[in-house]
């Protein structure tokens, strides 16, 4: 869903309109798109999603569970069905929708997914959501500057990485497009490129640490 190389061209109309994605959105809705491997999903992910939902005034947050992260080894990744089930276990509340839509769409990279969803749900105010750890490596994503031009982006603070992420290549490149956190609620209505960094209480869970504990338990 994410990284490296030039973005493919996705038709602005046609096939996207026929897709059955398992959720319905109406024009004018404010919708966060939260993509990731979620391998495994944990309360830190839920914290990022809920922080963005409440601070931005979002109607829905769609967790896009990727078929496979191109930067991660396949043997380290659980099946998409397992990761979707894990995400649903921690995604609390009716505003949270966990989806494997990318497998149905046939996209692997965020920029392509965004273009399909924008064509499918015209008039919906999408915001891309990521943790600060993702912002630190955002410049490695395929078509990352195009992502910034497609939708506003909300970055939520994460332990140990927030300072590094705010001095990352992406943060520097789009420094003048950063929205003050006090104006975060207006981000979905802002013409991109626009992004906000949301600070707040931190959740220290991480997928890496959870996988390591699982490996040790099996040893």
What does each model-found stretch correspond to?
Residues 2-219:
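Nucleotidyltransferase catalytic core that binds NTPs
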